[in-house]
Amino acid sequence: MSSRAQARRMAGFSLVELMVSIVIGLLAVLFATRMMTDSETTKRGALGGSDSMQNGMMAMFSISGDAEQAGYGLNDPILNGCDTLFTDNSGYALAAASRDGVGVTPLAAAVIVPGADGKPDQLTMYAGSAPGGTCTTRLLTNYIGGNQLVVDRPLYGFAVGDVIVVAPENGEGKCALAQVAALTGQGAAPAISIGDVRYRYNAGALARNFDGSASRIFNLGGEANLSFHTWLVRDGVLRLRATNLGADGEAAHAVADNIVSLKAQYGFDKRDAADFDPELGMQVGEWSSAMIDADDDGVTGGPGDYQRVAALRIAVVARAKTPERPGADGVCTAQPQAIKVFGSAQPQGVDPVEVELDVRVEDDPVDWRCYRYRTFETIVPLRNAGWRPTA
């Protein structure tokens, strides 16, 4: 070995060699970091898709389960769709609707409050729990205030604490919801005592008078099982207000997170009156996001229109928990187009009414297009609509 080579070896690496080694090391670290980052991004995307699938399925299962029971105990033509006077000491309120431009609170299987400009709807579904279904009796004497409802028959199926609704038989005027405080005898006729402050619903007198022999009293079952449910989406969370979910009926309890939209449509049976017989089955002839004059009586949102609702079409949109990174141009392409629902013709031959959604979440600084979404749709027949008395 020459003396020059030996001297170079003893001197160690040159500056150029050290710099080349550092560059190679940095490139290796950068490559490994990029691999780990891409792997983590893929993992988050996969987990986010799984989360949105689970959240969406749970949300749809919960809402559709309510829809299957909607209208139980409310399917009598005298009661279904009646504008109802209602107060609750725990704060629950009936859904507001319009009847030819006048505000009402109808008691029906389902009431949709449409969200403006593609924003989420509010879907309310009502159901009683009386074991006998539509338990009813007739008011015998005029009710002009007070806490006694004298009836014309023994109160079979009624119990203290049951929720009742008093309705005019001619369908004119409002109904009133109350709660049974006692079952008593008044002379030769049995009577229902109401207006007891120990009970939750309408602790005072009814807010209107009712004519004897021309008004019915319907039993909706016990207070604990009264299923008045309002579904809504707020701040990217599916929430539920309910009469049978804790002591606070006004509170909207969280059910599923990363739910950004809830949409619903009525499925109306539009057959002529001569052909309309719910006991022989209901059929959807028209979908609508808002209430219409389905029975052609000249009144939009009347009781007859709610009695023409054969099914509900429901859509839920779930969002991935983690947004994806924008492209080199700063634009996200995870969801490049607006989300639309209800675009397919179901049942066959019925024109769809497609709806474009606004899935933006209030106060979320991330562009909505940076998230991935899953849409869930279903149609739920209101089976209780066909199981109604005709006399």
Label every model-predicted segment.
Residues 375-391:
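Structural signal for terminal/edge beta-strands and the immediately following C-terminal loop/tail
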Residues 59-315, 321-372, 388-391:
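N-terminal pilin/flagellin-like segments and related low-complexity appendage regions
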